[in-house]
Amino acid sequence: MVNELENVPRASTLTNEEQTVDPSNNDSQEDISLGDSNEITSLASLKAIRSGNEEESGNEQVNHNDEAEEDPLLTRYHTACQRGDLATVKEMIHGKLLEVNNDGDSTEHITGLHWASINNRLSVVDFLVSQGADVNARAGALHATPLHWAARYGYVYIVDFLLKHGADPTMTDDQGFNLLHLSVNSSNIMLVLYVLFNVVSKGLLDIDCRDPKGRTSLLWAAYQGDSLTVAELLKFGASIKIADTEGFTPLHWGTVKGQPHVLKYLIQDGADFFQKTDTGKDCFAIAQEMNTVYSLREALTHSGFDYHGYPIKKWFKKSQHAKLVTFITPFLFLGIAFALFSHINPLFVIIVLFLLAIATNKGLNKFVLPSYGRMGVHNVTLLRSPLLSGVFFGTLLWVTIVWFFKVMPRTFSDEQYTNILMLVILVSVFYLFGQLVIMDPGCLPEETDHENVRQTISNLLEIGKFDTKNFCIETWIRKPLRSKFSPLNNAVVARFDHYCPWIFNDVGLKNHKAFIFFITLMESGIFTFLALCLEYFDELEDAHEDTSQKNGKCFILGASDLCSGLIYDRFVFLILLWALLQSIWVASLIFVQAFQICKGMTNTEFNVLMKESKSIGPDGLSFNENFNTTPEGFAPSIDPGEESNDTVLAPVPGSTIRKPRTCFGVCYAVTGMDQWLAVIKETIGIKDSTGHNVYSITSRIPTNYGWKRNVKDFWLTSDINAPLWRRILYPPSGSKALLNGIEVDYFKLYKLPNKDVEQGNDMV
């Protein structure tokens, strides 16, 4: 059942091209609403929720052809309101050609304010209201107000203006829909948030207000598969138990739609999947008839239930214990692998390890992952667990063990300083790894005071930036420049660089410098370990008088020290080989990070630029990915420094369709080799497959103040009174750091320092 609004273009899919809306052109519409219950014999025949006024759907507004025959002057006026032709509107009103309170057509009384509202023409709306236009005038087949018409398209700025000038949010149209219902139906999360904070939070509308069919806004959002709106409604306390006149709860309608994220939110909030409708069907029966079984099962398992809706047994009482087991598993697996390769035929070992890997994967998924704490809608997988950080820790631990018990005793007399250096590096790497795992990357606190959130929304509306790029819908704060929301930390991270699976944490403002120290020491430690192992293998060769067993057994290694290691201590040799393999991606990571620091950009900003160059999209078509409905001609005073950041983080128009990533591409990305290749291309100016010159893209980075300035900004804290060594080694103080040589607060960074201004009073 899809109501009259179902065929209206969603605010999230409107193109940036000028659009003049004439809903009279809707030839046919499937309407949302359940008709009489006797019309529905089974859910399999249920296509949509139908509205009560089926015969009026798609005919809400006047037909222009008929209107033109009746009154060409009125047609000209309404067309000007549609197109935002303020000059013509003013001319006609000031010239007394029309009266602002008598500007409706003769059939459905559609006013100029209605037309301006549904076409997002704020300047025309402002003028008409200033001339005394009735903001609560009813018109159209459903007798809707201009507020209703603006809300159905998700036009936040029009809704805000009308409410501030007397529009009544409690009024309903002939379908029984009020402002909250229509806002939810627009699927524009920004309008939903605006209404929740400025109308519902103030008690003007109940979060669970129903339409004539008994459906709440949560039920509508669940039916539409709008997970963003469902999440926000649940935060405001929307009831998951209220059923409509047919006995359908939000979970029932969510199952009809089959959107997994919606089902996850509802089930996590306590929705009853065993509850039955008036026809005696629960969610499992509905899923079978609507072919959404897979989505329901995914939501159930994600929320800790089996396919039949019963709790999955948890083998660990605490989530931390399960994560600890996942973290330790790679250490044991690597030890077994090295031991087997040391004593058994490699071909046989590969088969054994393959079977062991499958068994380990099955065991972790069945017995360990179910004990993880669930938060949000992201599936819990091994790649989203501490597994990869356990791989690194296991490698580090095995390197430490073989160095301490085997390598150091034989090489200390000849390589004292090298062994001491190895000890210092190992201690430092262990310490930094532990710190990076638990360290705050620069998380901004979420906002819980509704009054503060309302003020933030108001401020963003004033500057035309109330969208998901500037407002965090998860934490309800204004996003500072260069920040990003992290699902792992459930917070916005200042100067977000990237999520690193090897430390199971984000890298941001507060731990980025420590991360650079960490990977640099790691690479140094690997080559120090290599030098000691070569000395160790040489000692082994000297200890064995009979070296004939080396002949013909080392292949390409010849008679080198590495051959001695392979023959006399294969376990140490394999660990060294494994460590050297890690050094490849670590070296590429260091190279990429050094390049980005010199360019003055974060890893995330670099990724956005690279995705822009690889994007595939239809020519001339751009999608509103940020739910921005800023009216055309809206010209607030925006500082160039703030605006320039948009060129870095904003998606390129037409970039919503991208090349699919292969399995090899995923591995390539996890090790960071994809960025290494992109940096090489940028350095020598190679064009990508789409013909873009990567260098021409990165040259537009607004935070690039020259490589010397960028390096100083990264490595030096803003505390000019501290000694130089302290400024280099210590992380930023609180949320403050240098940018173009001046101190900025990254928690409140909404404007970038101007590149053209020479910083005379340098804080270096």
Curated annotation (Swiss-Prot):
| Pfam families per the UniProt record, alphabetical | Ank_2 (PF12796), DHHC (PF01529)
Q: Outline the ANK repeats, range by range.
A: 72-102, 108-137, 142-171, 175-204, 213-242, 246-275
- Protein encoded by which gene: AKR1
Give GO terms for biological process. Answer: negative regulation of pheromone-dependent signal transduction involved in conjugation with cellular fusion; protein palmitoylation; protein targeting to membrane; regulation of endocytosis
Q: Which GO terms describe its cellular component?
A: early endosome membrane; Golgi apparatus; Golgi membrane
Q: What is the organism field in this record?
A: Saccharomyces cerevisiae (strain ATCC 204508 / S288c) (Baker's yeast)
Which EC number applies?
Answer: 2.3.1.225
**Catalytic residues as annotated in Swiss-Prot or TrEMBL:** 500 (s-palmitoyl cysteine intermediate)
By its UniProt entry, which SUPFAM superfamilies does this protein fall under? Answer: Ankyrin repeat
Residue ranges of domain DHHC in the record: 470-520
Protein name as it appears in the record: Palmitoyltransferase AKR1
